Amino acid sequence: GDDVLSACCD
């Protein structure tokens, strides 16, 4: 979605 924190280190 719009979660930069989640997309950060995936």
Curated annotation (Swiss-Prot):
Keywords assigned by UniProt, alphabetized: Disulfide bond, Protease inhibitor, Serine protease inhibitor
UniProt-listed GO biological process terms: negative regulation of serine-type endopeptidase activity
Superkingdom of this protein's organism: Eukaryota
UniProt key word Disulfide bond: yes
The keyword Disulfide bond is annotated on this UniProt entry: yes
Quaternary state and interactors: Dimer.
Function: Inhibits trypsin (IC(50)=2.7 nM) and alpha-chymotrypsin (IC(50)=322 nM).
Similarity comment: Belongs to the Bowman-Birk serine protease inhibitor family.
Name recorded for this polypeptide: Bowman-Birk type proteinase inhibitor 1a
Organism the protein comes from: Lathyrus sativus (White vetchling)
